[in-house]
From Swiss-Prot:
It is found in: Secreted. This is Peptide PGLa-R5. Expressed by the skin glands. It comes from Xenopus ruwenzoriensis (Uganda clawed frog). Antimicrobial peptide. Belongs to the gastrin/cholecystokinin family. Magainin subfamily. The keyword Repeat does not apply. One of its GO terms (cellular component) is extracellular region. Keywords: Amidation, Amphibian defense peptide, Antimicrobial, Secreted. One of its GO terms (biological process) is defense response. The keyword Secreted applies. The modification Leucine amide is found at residue 21.
């Protein structure tokens, strides 16, 4: 649902942010 989709997107963004550090 919406919650799982948002969590997936946030997870991807977090991985990208961590990779950029």
């Amino acid at each position: 649902g919406m919650a799982s989709t948002a969590g997936s997107v946030l997870g991807k963004l977090a991985k990208v942010a961590i990779g950029a550090l």
